[in-house]
Amino acid sequence: MSELAKFFIEVAEKWQRRWAEAKVFEPSPQPGRPKFFITAAYPYPNGTIHIGHGRTYLVADVMARFRRHLGYNVLFPMAFHYTGTPILTIAEVIAAGDKAVIEEYKEIYGVSDDDIKKMGDPLYLAQYFHRRSKEAMIKFGLGIDWSREFTTIDPEYQRFIQWQFEKLRKRGLIVRGRHPVGWCPRHQMPVGAHDTKDDKEPEIGQWTLIYFVDGEGLVYPTATLRPETVPGVTNIWINPDAEYVVAEFEGRKMVLSKDAAYRLSFQGNVKVIREARGREFVGRRVLNPVTGEWVPVYEAKFVDPKVGTGVVMSVPAHAPYDYAALRDMGEVKLIPLIRVEGYGEYPAKEVVERMGIKSQTDPALEEATREVYSAEYTRGVVREDVVDRIAPHLPEPARSMVRAVFKLYFAGRPVKEAREFISKWLAEAGLGGVMYDIMNKPVYCRCGTEIVVKVLEDQWFINYGERGWKQLARQLVEEMAIIPQEAKAQFLATIDWLDKRACARTRGLGTPLPWSQGWVIESLSDSTIYMAFYTVIKKIRALGLRPEQLTEEFWDYVFLGQGSAAEVAKRIGVDPAALEEIRREFDYWYPLDSRNSGKDLIPNHLTFFIFNHVAIFPREKWPRQIVANGWVLREGEKMSKSKRNVLPLDKAVALYGPDPLRATLAIAAEVEQDLDFRDAEARRNSQQLMSIYNLVQRLAQSAVEREETWLDKWLISEVAHVLERAREAYEKVRLRQAAVELLYNAEAVFSQYLSMVDKPSKSAVEAAKAWVVALEPIVPHFAEELWQILGGEGFAATAPWPKLSPDPAALLAKRYVDMLIEDVKNIPAYKAGAKRVAIYVNGNYQWLRAAVGKDVKAAIEAGAPPQLAKRLVDFAKSMGEEVRGLVERVEQFDEYAALQSYKRYVEKALGVPVDIYKADDPQAPDLGGKKKAALPLKPGIFIEVG
């Protein structure tokens, strides 16, 4: 631990004790006072939280602290998520003696051998990391109300979740049936993002299978996402070196890759008859079920046996990979199917040749494929003459009947409509089927097993596909604030594609499904409205309510206002006043004002949060805002246990101290951006905080009581502007911008001020207090220490947001002086070796005010001599926008007095003595005839050269 880190840790521990003693972060309802209720996603205690968690919690903490300064009654609570498999899986792996995982936990988290031995018990593991993570949050300086802490296996919480699920079931939003889910073959259970390594949500997609048949009756089920292109198939591809099988599936003998047969076995009955290499099937001919054409089976090593069925159809007119491969073979045959504005008959050929792609191994084929597929899907229309290729092998009248259907629903239709039609038609005609797959594979369970898709029977699902529910969810997304705004489109897209989602499983910690024994509610389903539970758990415990008293009627009254307190209280055996007190607590804090989490939770938790709120709560209790921050990298790399580069939050605090760490996580990137945490930057920020500390000490120790000067007024005005910009940044959750303003720009202003004055004034101390209050949300312990040094009363954490008023005249004086210094330095005589500078001030400020934004006539009418008026107007036009604005706002300005006040500053900047004269003073010497050259804010300058 460095000396700097030690200093910051000692400061932090001091103020953490004092906050806890004063219960600064344990608010109670205060009717009539505005409230701000913010939550961040609670962590799984399957490891100590790391700096990625720390960033999310810091954003929430900064928002909470800022609102407290604005006068809000702020609630920021925290809990721990024990539910599901993340904890159980790690405990099982450790119990099994997995050396790699055990070494990871020792090296990354510093777990002792004794504790490792006990971690085969999932509850011990959870409680160990729960304690470590909570300690890390406290050391990090999060202003959390720990009096509301709970875990998701607490009996009170389980009663709450059972109430939630009964509500969803009674509204028809929980169903039982057949549906594809992500599945762990080892644990025989459905999985979601929180059950997988790296929290990767299994994305389930659907292939259309098209049954091509060879002369022996073997079926080659090509898997495609573009079934509308089947009339243009010229061949099919098989990987000659891959492992294939002949298997019975859906009453047919099929050729499948061995891997595909395994994956399909979770979706239906698959019986492997024999194994084979792919080359056994190369050279055969198969019948296209739509066109009746016999097409060859070609070998292609680019076919991935782990994708689809390992059997691929080739459409070279509309698939760049197929065109390039067949061109390499000299076997190109092009059949046009789709018209797209801006492309010719054969889009794939056109794009491949335009991009200069030379072979089927060219990486540019990926880009070519994206272009063609996107253009055809969004703007493509199936050609009318495609009908002539349909079913020529069928006898009449079947041929005409099929063609009539295709003419009506396929030819001339947009690609999207044609795709839907032909997928359905193939299945109904027995010429094709469906296969589900993990489209973002590989996805691994936390146990290390690769996830597959299983079609479950009699599984419980939350039906996020229900249309009315989707519409309410969209309505909330449109009404609420989402930061960053660009994330709104991702929420709407997620709402669109969400369908049934498995909500219960048969293993893991959690809440039993209330109406069906043997099922446990899964972790992404029991964590959607728990923000409401924070508002009441403290009162439930304080009033001594037992879990069995937390009935459906209890929750209906507390959260929905249904029934009367007297009747409900009588039935559950509590005091009606106690029940009303719990209801008032919820009613005061809800709705949630801001939900903070990582952007990776948009496709699951955050969208489920939206769905469940609109399903259960009345509109006035719907959440108001979501903030989704980016990831945290470390030294340019993604953090992962396998790389051993995960930085636990408690270790980071010990390494840098909490406030330098907070400053770095705030300043390194804006909220929506991914943040690259670098050691060098953390150390720079630590040094910057020490510079601020030394500056504030100097200011406090040397300040004197005296009349305010131009310099004092300038300091207050500059600080007022910095604080206004910081306030605007905080309000928009632009933490980086706020941190730059407060940690660097404000420090530069105070440093310059101290360089200009002999002794700082007491008003400078007041300006520093204002600065410290604005700093507090980012570096709270450090701010408290500075607040104490400056003589602030109470806590900086609870001080009101400062009200400093900028003085436009003081700002104008400083801008004027800086312009003068620049003018002098640009004069050749100064550069040649100035010995002394004489400055002649024209005090007719009103002439300049008249000239700004006006014309020569206005300047003359204000009293300016005609021979000067044109120069005045030209000078006014040359001033920067800020200075022009200040001149328009400042009615009276004593240029001579301002310059006298800044004389020491000017002499220091120029490095020579400076004499200041009034241009209209007859007693002043007219050196070089510069009296008449002076204009308001543009003095005459004479330089004596030595």
From Swiss-Prot:
GO process terms (BP): leucyl-tRNA aminoacylation
Which SUPFAM superfamilies does the entry link to? Answer: Anticodon-binding domain of a subclass of class I aminoacyl-tRNA synthetases (SSF47323), Nucleotidylyl transferase (SSF52374), ValRS/IleRS/LeuRS editing domain (SSF50677)
Question: Which stretch carries the motif 'KMSKS' region?
Answer: 638-642
- Gene3D superfamilies, alphabetically? Class I aminoacyl-tRNA synthetases (RS), HUPs, Isoleucyl-tRNA Synthetase, Domain 1, leucyl-tRNA synthetase, Valyl/Leucyl/Isoleucyl-tRNA synthetase, editing domain
Q: What is its EC number?
A: 6.1.1.4
Record key words, sorted: Aminoacyl-tRNA synthetase, ATP-binding, Cytoplasm, Ligase, Nucleotide-binding, Protein biosynthesis
Localization = Cytoplasm
Q: Which PROSITE patterns match?
A: AA_TRNA_LIGASE_I (PS00178)
Catalysed reactions, as listed in the record: tRNA(Leu) + L-leucine + ATP = L-leucyl-tRNA(Leu) + AMP + diphosphate
**Motif ('HIGH' region) on chain:** 43-53
Q: Which residues form a coiled coil?
A: none
Enzyme class, UniProt record, top EC level: ligase
The protein's GO terms of the molecular function aspect are: aminoacyl-tRNA deacylase activity; ATP binding; leucine-tRNA ligase activity
This entry carries the following GO cellular component terms, namely:
cytoplasm
Sites where the protein binds ATP: 641
Intrachain disulfide bonds: none
Q: From what superkingdom does this record's organism come? A: Archaea
Which PANTHER family does the record match to this protein?
A: LEUCINE--TRNA LIGASE, CYTOPLASMIC (PTHR45794:SF1), LEUCYL-TRNA SYNTHETASE (PTHR45794)
Q: Record's family?
A: Belongs to the class-I aminoacyl-tRNA synthetase family.
**What is this protein's name?**
Leucine--tRNA ligase
In the record, what lineage is assigned to the organism producing the protein? Archaea, Thermoproteota, Thermoprotei, Thermoproteales, Thermoproteaceae
